[in-house]
Amino acid sequence: MPVSWSMLRNHAPTALAAARALAHRAAQWPARAACANLVPAPDDSHASLSWDPDMAALLGQPLDGGVRVGLRVAVHELVFTTESRCDALPLTGKPDAEVGSWLDGKLVAEGLKPASGTKLPYEVPSTMFARAGEEALRFPAIALWFAAAAEALGELRQSYRRYTPGPSPVRCWPHHFDIAILVALEEGRAESARSIGIGVSPGDNYYAQPYLYVSPYPKPDTADLPPLPPGARYDPRARILPRTLPAPSWAVLTRRAAR
């Protein structure tokens, strides 16, 4: 079902910070399951998630036996899927120990390694300021941002297929919780070959609202680049987002929402 882009206007973007932080933290469970059971990929894509529009969930990479662990963002619940069933655990009010025990039990029952003790190679986001019970009305808005981003990036990915090696799959990265594609513009080592990252973040420490970004590599000199349209800016401060394009007041979504 196509995303109703106009619904992105239902919540003020700056009101989503707490719901986003809770969803970000919850997305670490699929990442832990992947890190515990998959061979590490050089780009960490083994721990990435993808948006499944049918389940309305961010799903981790497939594990042995067709198992996938994911997060239904709109209802804030962990899902555990096999080829024959889908089990779910509502996360509201659940301590990490209880969630970890539930997930470990599911994994071990399928002959997989437990995930709760897996140490991630980055700091897990804090949710000390957020209460899941107070964010029930805003979780669907976070889910809608991911659904809209996945749809738009999927279309954009098709338009960049003329390049070689070309665009990556649309992936959500649990470290920063952004969803993006990477368009490789030439063959060669990742640390030297030209590429462009294009993605959407639901918000982070730099911008407390969802935003769009374009991240060319190698990093260009902003003095040599043309002016950007209203609502966009060059932002060399961000650690992984050398060029960030915020979308305040929904300006960037106006034409898309009118489709």
Tell what function each PLM region has.
Residues 2-68:
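N-terminal ordered "arm"
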Residues 14, 87-95, 130, 134-144, ...:
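Conserved aromatic-histidine-acidic binding/catalytic patches
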Residues 21, 235-259:
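TerminUS-proximal long segments
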Residues 48-122:
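Long, hydrophobic/aromatic-enriched structural stretches that serve as scaffold segments
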Residues 62-91, 202-245:
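Intrinsically disordered, low-complexity regulatory segments enriched in Ser/Thr/Pro
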Residues 104, 108-109, 115, 129, ...:
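Short loop/turn segments that flank or connect secondary-structure elements
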Residues 114-166:
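Surface-exposed beta-loop interaction hotspot
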Residues 150-223:
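Secondary-shell segments that build the walls of catalytic and ion/ligand-binding clefts
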